[in-house]
Amino acid sequence: MESIFHEKQEGSLCAQHCLNNLLQGEYFSPVELSSIAHQLDEEERLRMAEGGVTSEDYRTFLQQPSGNMDDSGFFSIQVISNALKVWGLELILFNSPEYQRLRIDPINERSFICNYKEHWFTVRKLGKQWFNLNSLLTGPELISDTYLALFLAQLQQEGYSIFVVKGDLPDCEADQLLQMIKVQQMHRPKLIGEELAHLKEQSALKADLERVLEAADGSGIFDEDEDDLQRALAISRQEIDMEDEEADLRRAIQLSMQGSSRSMCENSPQTSSPDLSSEELRRRREAYFEKQQQQQQEVDRPGPLSYPRERPTTSSGGRRSDQGGDAVSEEDMLRAAVTMSLETAKDNLKAERKK
């Protein structure tokens, strides 16, 4: 592909690019094409003068600008046709009745010149392959034999005029090289405007990225991924909620213990300790159950006589009655303490929730 001559668009000099891409070299310049255009203008003036230099048509012709060129660099089909005659080449309209009667397969031709409004470009066969040498492209575009007819038909549908170039084109390096090898094109060339827009977009994105990196370096904070940031925030919120729940639970337990302590102080005998911890309550319950078991064992154990030994009613009986009273009072006290502890914990927790 590097051996193919391809002039890219400059201004409105597409006619010059079309001819040079066709001939595969810098054969024509704007000055040479302008000279051909002036010759055509002079020939047209002479023909108009044949009707009389004083005629209205002649004066109108002189006032009109040239139809073969303009200041932008545009050149007419007549200029292109005359330029090709220097090389013995001729242009024939592709869709003319004369050419269509010949029924020539497009792949058997050597080159085409295509025109739409003021734009010209060449489609040429180099070696055994066809190439679109449009100067608006960033490079030559490979066209397969099967796609060539469809490509030309598409151009006609879009309003292009297509001319067949007849004659022997000058030899060129690309044609000789591609006679021996075939090229493959992995990526089609883009239009120059698209390439410039793509480069500008990349430049803008690069500038934005650099600004973001500079800002990140200045602040010391850079979030590589927005999703990671959202997940981190969600986890942080969950941890805060868990901490709040744990704090509520600790306050409820503390209030429960305070309430149970107050209840036990109010309901316990004055001889007991003013503050009973949970450990003390547990020890008292164990002592109560052990005493109950010992009493049951004494009742069930048989004595040396068939009747139980009598005991003084005043002392021993009084002591047994006191022990039973102490046991009952301790049992009631434990039950009441546990019940009041649970109720107090519930009430305190509800009050804390309302706050």
Curated annotation (Swiss-Prot):
Pfam entry (one): UIM
Comp. bias intervals (Polar residues): 257-275
Post-translational changes noted in the entry: Monoubiquitinated by UBE2W, possibly leading to activate the deubiquitinating enzyme activity.
Entry keyword Nucleus: yes
Region (Disordered) residue spans: 257-355
Subunit structure: Interacts with STUB1/CHIP (when monoubiquitinated). Interacts with DNA repair proteins RAD23A and RAD23B. Interacts with BECN1 (via its poly-Gln domain). Interacts with PRKN, UBR2, VCP and tubulin.
PANTHER family in the cross-refs: ATAXIN-3-RELATED
Protein name: Ataxin-3
Highest classification ranks of the organism: Eukaryota, Metazoa, Chordata, Craniata, Vertebrata
